[in-house]
From Swiss-Prot:
<feature type="compositionally biased region" description="Basic and acidic residues">
    <location>
        <begin position="331"/>
        <end position="351"/>
    </location>
</feature>
<dbReference type="InterPro" id="IPR044257">
    <property type="entry name" value="TRM32-like"/>
</dbReference>
<feature type="compositionally biased region" description="Polar residues">
    <location>
        <begin position="352"/>
        <end position="371"/>
    </location>
</feature>
<dbReference type="Pfam" id="PF14309">
    <property type="entry name" value="DUF4378"/>
</dbReference>
<protein>
    <recommendedName>
        <fullName>Protein TRM32</fullName>
    </recommendedName>
</protein>
<feature type="region of interest" description="Disordered">
    <location>
        <begin position="295"/>
        <end position="379"/>
    </location>
</feature>
<dbReference type="InterPro" id="IPR025486">
    <property type="entry name" value="DUF4378"/>
</dbReference>
Length: 552
């Protein structure tokens, strides 16, 4: 297919449709697209460095005509040449330059002021004025940008000194060369120098800030060290003062009771490493009972020496306490003296009685008593608890007829020996068999008053101990000595309300004692609460089972 299609006018058969040309030519004739042009692209030769652009002949033809090209070049040059009125306008001055020129003319008119300015330059330099903040920056409408050279040659007017001009001279660096200021815009070198100077200024400011921060941190650290040193010195001084006061108090009687006791303990430890026993408070149970219990036993020479040492230590403690109390009040001192005399007498009496008993005893009983003495010596440094006091109480109670009767009843019934006491019960409300009452009357040699009452109290105590055993958290049922202690405690408590002292009491007092003061009285609802919890558990369990059966 050719680049140029033939028009219908150029064809020989004009006005007729030529069927021999083909269907594509017919479509192009219909669209009236007679000139079909191709896009001219540059052709790259050998290397990408050298490019030659090949144009079609039709595009190169108009540029080959020299006349047309010359006329075009002349028109372009004519457009670039400035005209005379335009050059005159460019030579005109800006508004800023005009204002400066007018100010200068006004200064020249006033000859006196001009002469003073020329003569007194040194005085003006010696009294510099502080510039306003906006004066260091260029005005928004200025014709040229601010440079370092401009800042070095700024002129400022001081209206208070009759229009005197203040000249500012900034010291320049040796590296910067003095260049004349041209009225036209600055070059690229000036911009670079100005930026370099600003950067150097910021660096210097940064260094100054870093140095100030370092100095500040150093001063803070020094202050902290000083404060710590001062605090340490204060603590050392205070401790030294306390030590001095303590040393003074040790020499005199100004020490507290705790310090006195510790000081005396140290002395006693230095003498002999034996435990020290102090006098107990009068409100608590005294150790007289323990002393009588110990005096019943034979003692060796070692035990006698221990007693003498304990008595000496007690005397020293009594003397120290006496000196403190005598300073407080003479009445207390007199009471303490009387009390000490009584204690000394009681101790002497116990010692005499013990010596007499030791002489009366036979030599065969000595080894057994020595064993008991050794046991008591081991108990003394450890301190005696409630169990030891209870043992002594029971030894005293062996002589009591009531206690012996209760013990015999429990032995004969079998509650002391067997653990399973439920098998021995006569009935639910009465655990003891009533026939035991007559058997004990036959066996007993000594007569006891109110045997039936004691028998009923033992029955009641057995029932209470059985009910007192916890249901929800069950424990082992007591037997033996423990069971005897529980039963006798309940019987003794009930007997204490039947003495001669309680005969004058009213019925309300007796009922209140039974209801409120008794540990297992009517107000103790532990058993009932446990039964209720068990019943609630059963009900909840039954409801849950019913729901599960209904669902499935």
């Amino acid at each position: 297919m050719g680049k140029h299609l033939k028009n219908e006018s150029s064809s020989p058969n004009h006005g007729k449709y030529n069927h021999k040309l083909g269907w594509l030519a017919g479509m192009l004739h219909v669209l009236d697209f007679h000139h079909w042009r191709t896009k001219n692209r540059p052709i790259c030769w050998k290397t990408p460095r050298t490019h030659s652009l090949m144009r079609e002949t039709e595009e190169q033809e108009p540029f080959l005509d020299s006349k047309i090209n010359d006329s075009k070049m002349l028109s372009v040059v004519a457009d670039n040449k400035p005209t005379r009125p335009e050059t005159k306008l460019k030579k005109t001055m800006t508004t800023k330059q005009v204002t400066e020129y007018v100010d200068f003319l006004e200064i020249l008119r006033k000859e006196d002021v001009f002469v003073k300015i020329m003569k007194d330059q040194v005085q003006i330099k010696s009294n510099p004025r502080v510039l306003p903040k906006s004066g260091s920056f260029p005005i928004s409408g200025s014709s040229r940008p601010a440079r370092i050279q401009h800042k070095q040659k700024e002129n400022w007017y001081a209206p208070k000194q009759n229009g005197a001009v203040l000249t500012l001279k900034v010291p320049r660096d040796t590296s910067q060369e003095c260049k004349p200021i041209s009225p036209s815009h600055g070059s690229a070198d000036d911009d670079h120098g100005f930026n370099h100077a600003i950067i150097n200024g910021f660096r210097e400011i940064k260094k100054l800030l870093k140095n100030t921060l370092k100095d500040r941190n150093r001063t803070k650290k020094k202050k902290k060290k000083k404060v710590l040193d001062v605090a340490k010195d204060d603590y050392v001084g205070r401790y030294s003062q306390l030590l001095k006061q303590i040393s003074r108090r040790e020499g005199g009687d100004l020490r507290s009771k705790s310090l006195k006791l510790s000081y005396e303990e140290k002395k006693s430890d230095s003498r002999d490493n034996k435990p020290q026993f102090f006098r107990r408070i009068s409100s608590l149970s005294s150790l007289e009972v323990l002393g009588s219990f110990l005096t019943d036993l034979p003692r060796d020479s070692s035990t006698s020496n221990q007693e003498t040492r304990i008595s000496e230590d007690q005397d020293t403690n009594f003397g120290a306490k006496k000196s403190v109390l005598s300073s407080e009040s003479p009445v207390r001192a007199e009471k303490e003296e009387k009390y000490e005399v009584q204690e000394e007498r009681s101790q002497e009496n116990h010692l005499d009685s013990s010596n007499q008993r030791i002489l009366q005893q036979e030599p065969d009983s000595v080894p057994s008593t020595n064993k008991t003495a050794e046991k008591t010596e081991t108990l003394l440094p450890q301190g005696l608890g409630l169990s030891s006091l209870e043992i002594y109480k029971h030894e005293e109670e062996d002589e009591d007829a009531y206690f012996c009767y209760v013990k015999k009843v429990l032995k004969v019934s079998g509650f002391l020996e067997n653990k399973d006491n439920e098998e021995k019960w006569y009935s639910e409300e009465q655990p003891l068999n009533p026939s035991l009452l007559y058997e004990l009357d036959i066996q007993e040699e000594e007569t006891v008053n109110d045997k039936e009452l004691l028998f009923d109290l033992v029955n009641e105590a057995i029932v209470e101990t059985q009910n007192h055993s916890q249901i929800y958290f069950p424990k082992t049922f007591p037997y033996g000595k423990r069971y005897l202690d529980e039963v006798w405690g309940r019987v003794e408590w009930s007997l204490s309300g039947l003495g001669a002292e309680n005969r004058d009491r009213s019925l309300d007092d007796i009922v209140g004692r039974d209801l409120l003061t008794k540990s297992d009285g009517w107000m103790n609802l532990q058993g009932e609460s446990e039964w209720l919890t068990l019943e609630l558990e059963d009900l909840i369990f039954d409801d849950v089972l019913d729901e599960l059966l209904c669902v499935y």
